């Protein structure tokens, strides 16, 4: 019974933490950028084009430079990727997304290291993965040098 009550309390506190993050300026900025991105017709056109060319690019990559359309599709992919990256709404959204992800990474590492310095907390962020005992994505087999308990 005690473990169940403790689990309920921990989940409740985790929900409170999630609510605090949701109410943060960073999360609000993320939602605003996402909304602006969704409402922008030009960004939508670029994203749809990117998805279409990406599918073609993945098909071409199976055969590599031996595919007859390899050069053309690769060129189109670079062009649309550049157009996507240079779009203000897309850039703002990516920046907001990275800022929110940084907060989530910080919280994950903080909680993990508070429990134990040996807890593996892969974040996908090289800075935070260096602070954790896990190099990220190791499958906890210890081959990355992390401390497997």
Curated annotation (Swiss-Prot):
InterPro entries: Bact_com_dev_regulator, Com_YlbF, YheA/YmcA-like_dom_sf. SUPFAM superfamilies: YheA/YmcA-like. Disulfide bonds: none annotated. Keywords: Competence, Cytoplasm, Sporulation. It comes from Bacillus subtilis (strain 168). It is found in: Cytoplasm. It holds the Pfam family Com_YlbF. GO terms for cellular component: cytoplasm. GO terms for biological process: establishment of competence for transformation; sporulation resulting in formation of a cellular spore. The keyword Lipid metabolism does not apply. Regulates sporulation prior to stage II. Positively controls the competence regulator ComK at a post-transcriptional level. May modulate the translation, stability or activity of ComS. May work together with YmcA to regulate community development. It comes from the Bacteria. Its main location: cytoplasm. Transmembrane segments: none annotated. This is Regulatory protein YlbF.
